[in-house]
């Protein structure tokens, strides 16, 4: 049964923390600190409160959170020690059903990424609509982000973590972000007008016109 904001706002601190358990991978203090700002008028307000807690915690805490996440199709998946949430997400993306070639490719990408940045590659594998990216999309994102700057990539990992949390929170509260999905669909339709090399990937480029 889906949670409600009324239940969250009226619960004891311990009960409320239990309701939000599992949002941030092995890192309950973010939600716990955000809960001190109750009552929340909307889920958006709760999400924002959690992002501010992490932003204010500083770089060391942020990197520790990133490192608390498992690799995609990594050792934790093989040994079946993923959290229930991560298991569901990686399964939906097909990562538990890789071919030997796909598995070897992802393992090598994991190793290369970790060697360069010092933390695991983080991607919200359920994607912009929450239904799951496919393995090709995941590998393409992996390869693209391997070329990023460490400072930018740290922020990209945090952005994906917040997206993962948003999806998990929506699941807990039975929320379907229909307006956000509609905006995404519009972007997909517009992407056919992108420049060559981008349209094929479903990516939208923007051209700014200036006075002649």
Which sequence ranges carry the predicted segments?
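Aromatic-anchored, charged helix-turn/loop surface patch used as a conserved interaction hotspot
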Residues: 5-10, 22, 29-109, 113, ...
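An amphipathic alpha-helix signature
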Residues: 13-17
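Generic secondary-structure signature for well-ordered alpha-helical cores
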Residues: 25, 147, 166, 170, ...
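Residue-level signal for inorganic ion chemistry
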Residues: 27-28, 34, 121, 190
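C-terminal non-catalytic interaction appendages of large macromolecular assemblies
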Residues: 98-172
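N-terminal capping segment at the start of a domain
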Residues: 180-210
């Amino acid at each position: 049964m889906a949670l409600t904001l009324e239940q969250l706002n009226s619960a004891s601190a311990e009960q409320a923390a239990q309701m939000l358990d599992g949002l941030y991978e092995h890192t309950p203090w973010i939600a716990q600190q955000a809960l001190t700002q109750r009552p929340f008028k909307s889920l958006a307000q709760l999400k924002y409160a959690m992002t501010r807690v992490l932003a204010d915690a500083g770089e060391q805490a942020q990197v520790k959170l990133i490192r608390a996440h498992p690799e995609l199709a990594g050792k934790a998946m093989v040994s079946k020690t993923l959290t229930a949430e991560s298991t569901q997400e990686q399964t939906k993306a097909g990562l538990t059903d890789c071919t030997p070639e796909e598995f070897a490719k992802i393992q090598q990408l994991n190793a290369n990424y970790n060697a360069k940045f010092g933390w695991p590659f983080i991607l919200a594998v359920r994607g912009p609509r929450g239904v799951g990216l496919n393995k090709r999309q995941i590998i393409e994102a992996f390869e693209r982000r391997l070329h990023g700057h460490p400072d930018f990539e740290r922020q990209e990992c945090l952005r994906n973590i917040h997206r993962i949390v948003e999806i998990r929170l929506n699941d807990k509260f039975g929320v379907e972000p229909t307006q956000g999905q509609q905006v995404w669909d519009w972007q997909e339709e517009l992407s056919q007008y992108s420049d060559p090399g981008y349209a094929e990937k479903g990516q939208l480029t923007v051209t700014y016109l200036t006075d002649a």
